Structure formats: structure tokens, C-alpha cells
Amino acid sequence: MAKKEKKAKVATITTKSGESLKVFEELNDFETFLRGEVEDNEFDHVHCKAKYYPPFVLHESHDDPEKIKDTNNSHNKKFVRHLHQHVEKHLLKDIREMFQNPDLKFKNKSKEETFEKITWHYADESELNAKKFRIQLDVTCTHDGAMVDVDYRTEPIAAQEPVI
């Protein structure tokens, strides 16, 4: 019996500004999409989002979203610590590997914390196939659940005109 092929869970929404935006429900689908954009050489002008449960949360609940504890949210120090480790050691590392650029360090980091949510901002500039681009990643967790929002954006950097 053949294995049933899993279809990517993605929705395309239109923002208020008229931008078409892909929203992924699983981290693997999000990463597969980004790899495809890099392979197609269309990586320098991408904006997409992912809303997913982090792997460590799913592992804890035996891959059953119904069993995820209500305490897994931005008010839980252990959850926040594990999420930050997941982002730094896995998500950013995977993006670095996609672009085959070990120098992509996301040096511009910041953290924004309110009662409702915690957002980590990462940004850096890179070059691939003679295209310079800026990459920005915002990772948000809220006080009302374990779902994580990732906002991924790349934009080209205009080539500097020669000084005469």
C-alpha cells in the first residue's frame, strides 16, 4: 500500500496594503517553501508567515495538539527559554544553511516584551548568486497559547552606483 502524500497546509491571504502573503501551518512546509525559493533564485523578495506549534511542545504532548498544556505561553519562563533556544539553534541555523552562508549571523537582534506577547526580531544582510538582500525575521509568542508566529521577509538591497 502506497504512502499517502502529505499536502502542505498553506493559506494565501491579502493584507490591507494589497500584498499577497502565504501563511504556513507547519514549520516543515514553511522551510520547504523557503528552500524552493532559494533553488528558484527568487529568494530576495519574499514575505511569508508561519503559525505553528514548536517541535518541543508537540514532543511533550506526543504530537497531539489537544494535549498541549495551557501553561505553554509567553508567561511561562521554561516555555520562553525553550522557544528562544529553538529559534536560535534550529530555525536560524536552518535559514543559514538554506542560503549556504555560515556568515549569516543575524547580528541585529532585539527583544520586545509586553504582558500580551514576546517578540524576537532578527535581521541581517547577505549575498547569494551576486544578489544582495536584507533578511528580517520576527518570532512572536503570546500569553494565550503555545502557537508561535514567524514573520519572514527578504528584500533586495539596491546596488551602489559608482562614485564619479
From Swiss-Prot:
GO biological process, any: energy reserve metabolic process
Domain of life, source organism: Eukaryota
Similarity comment: family membership: Belongs to the RGI1 family.
Biological function: Involved in the control of energetic metabolism and significantly contribute to cell fitness, especially under respiratory growth conditions.
Keyword tags: Cytoplasm
Entry-linked InterPro entries: RGI1, RGI1_sf
Subcellular location per the Swiss-Prot or TrEMBL entry: Cytoplasm
Gene Ontology CC terms, in alphabetical order: cytoplasm
A UniProt-annotated Pfam family: RGI1
Stated name of the protein: Respiratory growth induced protein 2
Keyword check for Zinc: no
